[in-house]
Amino acid sequence: MSQRVVMGLKAVQAVAGRTDPTAPLAVGALAQELGLTLSRASRLLAELDEAGFAERSGGYGAYRVGSRAVRLSGRAAAPVARSLRYAMTLAGQLTGETVCLAVPVAGGMRVIASVESLWTLHAPAEVGELITDADSAIVRSAPGRNETSGQPGQSGHTGDTRLLESTIGMSVEIATPVFGPDGDCVAVLAVRLPTNRYGQNAQRSRHAVDTARRSIESTLVDVQGRQRPPGDVAADGVTPPSALEAAFRVLEHLAAGRDSVAGTARATGLRADRVQRLIDACRAAGMVVASADRTRYQLGWAVHGWHRAAFAPTIVERAKPLVAATANETRTCGFITVLKGMRSFTLVEELEMAGEGLRMAPWIGRPHPMIGSDGGPTLVMDLTAEEVAELFPTRHSKHELVQFLSRVREVVADGVLTMQAYDDAGIVSISAPVRDSSGFVAAAVCIVGTTSYMRDNARTFEEAARKLAADVSAILG
């Protein structure tokens, strides 16, 4: 039974841990990856589908990540989501390069978070990417890896014993392990940059990586010091679930924070001896980690990447019809924008316009400076004023920062922001926050139209923006 649980959890990771977990994965491909017969893989995926951790997609015998897996990922990532975004975005601002976070998984290191460089020529790091090259600084920074001394930029040390560097092809990695309060390595943080910018950016990147690492480790100390949120206690007499369903319940309980076997048993309604066996299976599958004294358990960080990797394709596929419906109903232009570094990036747009002879220029796939973006203040509303000020581009004046922070406070207070376009006369935008399964603001919906038309219908359109944001948030889990 434990082996079936282990294989089921490995199947979940195979489906959810990809760069695009919403893309169809054929049963045959999964069977080959896990070394299963086709019939066994098919039965396993059908069970995952029934449980909500996978769902049918595309043609017959293909599956994608399930909504329950996305919710598990977001819930597990929630305690560190805001601080992680801030630390990595700041490192990206200081260097101009790609910043990524990776965790050990079977076969290598998996990228679970990334802030990609906005340079035309850059070294990418995609959430879900599996790093397998043994020479990679990210791989060598993980616990249990051999470290080869050498010169910076040549797969060696940098002088700081916590920093390693490597050059693979035309890309340089500067990496450092991130340790939890118990002394365990929870992840590896790195900057990736092209070799042609190494000379001018290496020292800056080392400093940025080290600063971000310290910030994340400080957050981990705070998180561990918090009391676990109270959870529901399972009712007595509940029919024992299947082994795989029982494992999922254990994972969902641990996603809210570390707990003991006894605490997990009380919360899930399972016997303590069964919980111990399930936790052992979850550890064997690489999804649960133990405290140093083996008395408390929590989800490993590998699951944190699932909801992030699913985010953009889900928005494009499932939120676009919602934006189109709102734009058509209100006779406005509708957009969904996300944060890319400290720029706003449009993922979805629907261009309608109340005004004969007028046209809105398309923004799809184009980054825009945060200060002039319709959704800019909304996208950073989870950050503190001090954090926003530190991230704010230095080319802008203090007056512009004060005005921007005022708009951030407004959207925090009202849940919606109406503002005149920064550098586009005659346009008013209304934005509202979209939250992913971690509860963190991951996008902004924007309704845009001519000044007179938007002012005349302000209350109606503000409610439309709130509803659209809530509907998109529901899609994300």
What are the residue ranges of the model-derived segments?
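A short, hydrophobic, proline-anchored segment that marks a local hinge/packing element in signaling
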Residues: I174-G183, I430-S438
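Non-catalytic C-terminal interaction regions
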Residues: T332, V338, M342, V348-E356, ...
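Long, low-complexity, charge-rich intrinsically disordered regions
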Residues: V127, G159, L163-S166, P177-T195, ...
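Amphipathic alpha-helical effector-binding/dimerization core
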Residues: R64-S149, H304, R308-F392
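N-terminal helix-turn-helix
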Residues: M1-G74, S218, G231-A310, A470-I475
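Short, basic/aromatic recognition patches
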Residues: P79, S83-A91, A137-T176, R204, ...
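Long compositionally biased, domain-poor regions of proteins
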Residues: Q93, P181, I216, A256-G257, ...
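Juxtadomain coupling helices with adjacent low-complexity linkers
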Residues: S149-G153, H157-L164, I168-S171, C185-L244, ...
